[in-house]
Amino acid sequence: MPPHLALPFRRLFWSLASSQLIPRRHRGHSLLPTTPEAHTDGSVPVFIRALAFGDRIALIDKYGHHTYRELYDRSLCLAQEICRLQGCKVGDLQEERVSFLCSNDVSYVVAQWASWMSGGVAVPLYWKHPEAQLEYFIQDSRSSLVVVGQEYLERLSPLAQRLGVPLLPLTPAVYHGATEKPTEQPVEESGWRDRGAMIFYTSGTTGRPKGALSTHRNLAAVVTGLVHSWAWTKNDVILHVLPLHHVHGVVNKLLCPLWVGATCVMLPEFSAQQVWEKFLSSEAPQITVFMAVPTVYSKLLDYYDKHFTQPHVQDFVRAVCKERIRLMVSGSAALPVPLLEKWRSATGHTLLERYGMTEIGMALSNPLTEARVPGSVGTPLPGVEVRIISENPQKGSPYIIHAEGNERGTKVTPGFEEKEGELLVRGPSVFREYWDKPEETKSAFTSDGWFRTGDTAVFKDARYWIRGRTSVDIIKTGGYKVSALEIERHLLAHPSITDVAVIGVPDMTWGQRVTAVVALQEGHSLSHGDLKEWARGVLAPYAVPSELLLVEEIPRNQMGKVNKKELLKQLYPSGQRSQPGQG
């Protein structure tokens, strides 16, 4: 056992021995009992609710502990400075965009809340994005101001100067406490519902990233649905390790706990060692909730395999995780079943899989307390309506409905049982528009107002299953349609494969050929012939990869996703095609 974990293990051993590992009972969820009557409007921003939680600890980061009252006061001070700088006489930016670049710490929350308090739309930037992308986001959103943490000031100053956008550096008071109280200027508690709140930029797999503009109502709809379905309470403590420019990191992992008065422990960035230390620490507050992408869970298991080798240590880790942590969630990318099973063996937790995207927040989720089925994304969350459809070549109706459901249940059209189709979503969580792109916004919705996700899905066994992006994950080969994600799930069970991406490569004979891009376990080898022989035992003949490409590493973004269009371009430059079986 590594020395840095020895002390936490000893402390935990005695605390757990004394309690005899009695399972913690998680009581049924009571919706926000601490919320004052004046704040029961479900569409208010999260900072309006902060005063109800006063001196409770909201955040713990490298700078220390920060209460809800402190977050509110510091945010209000910054909001007033923003208004002074921008010259807004009535204290309202009228939805002007405020870009901000902050680390995963208290500065992010203060910048976000201040953007809202001043009447602006928050545009979060990410420090790992290249300068050209940061410039694009600031320019495309037409931000009137850029708020920046001290550590990024030198990097952003030339960029802001070139764009002619004012730069507002954060002061030490944001991190360590205000030296003066904000001017008494109460923030309005009504009128937020339809105002713009945040612009999240999409991954840009079909061109330049688009800014998805969500209102305060949209954000609140996602948050309240998750708070109810996942039983968030003020006693929860979540460990935050994800980037803060996507729905997963911002809404699921930050706004949800702050909505109910819970505590968020923020790491500057992901570290497998630090995550395990937090899981196993006997010091208060102890982690009760964890959410991450599959890549994070994979790296945590790599650390587990290297450092927790003794059986009694593994038993100890499993016991602590089961007793202390009530919920572990995976999302943003498909969760390989072997990874789910290995995590369950190590921690006793079956990861909760869910489905969402930038434009809709969260839409589908496995149950909190009932059985979770690997590979399924469960059923609709509260307030969400979904449809699975196919285009209708006949006049009179825009499409044929295969299945239609909400949180109360799903109705399947006779004759369309277990038929795949495009997933549509409708509800208060669906975004308002693509910023400054009316035509793209219009084409993203059906004529009757449903958002087109671009994902292929199926309803079977009383659950929804995502087959993948229709554009890249549904491969048409020899007259068959096969799911790249399904093939990937099976191939990841091969003992020599550590990562895989399945792509459809244009082919004169088959239309597309199934190509497996594979990263191998260290010291392993794999031929195409061996892979085909193995795959025939788990896949239909037409789904067996006709080509194998071996790579050192499969490129993934910060959320664990593979840009398959870019991967195809990298592996097959214009005019070049490798022969089947290469690798």
Swiss-Prot record:
Coiled coil regions, renumbered to chain: none
CDD domains: MCS (cd05941)
Keyword RNA-binding recorded: no
Sorted UniProt keywords: ATP-binding, Fatty acid metabolism, Ligase, Lipid metabolism, Mitochondrion, Nucleotide-binding, Transit peptide
Protein residues bound to ATP: 202-210, 455, 469, 561
Reactions catalysed according to its record: tetracosanoate + ATP + CoA = tetracosanoyl-CoA + AMP + diphosphate; malonate + ATP + CoA = malonyl-CoA + AMP + diphosphate
Known EC number: 6.2.1.76
Transit peptide start-stop: 1-27
One Gene Ontology cellular component: mitochondrion
Leading EC class: ligase
Domain of life of the native organism: Eukaryota
Leader peptide range in chain numbering: none
Subcellular location: Mitochondrion
GO process terms (BP): fatty acid biosynthetic process; malonate catabolic process
GO molecular-function terms, A-Z: acid-thiol ligase activity; ATP binding; malonyl-CoA synthetase activity
Family: Belongs to the ATP-dependent AMP-binding enzyme family.
Known role: Catalyzes the initial reaction in intramitochondrial fatty acid synthesis, by activating malonate and methylmalonate, but not acetate, into their respective CoA thioester. May have some preference toward very-long-chain substrates.
Protein name in UniProt: Malonate--CoA ligase ACSF3, mitochondrial
Species of the source: Mus musculus
Gene: Acsf3
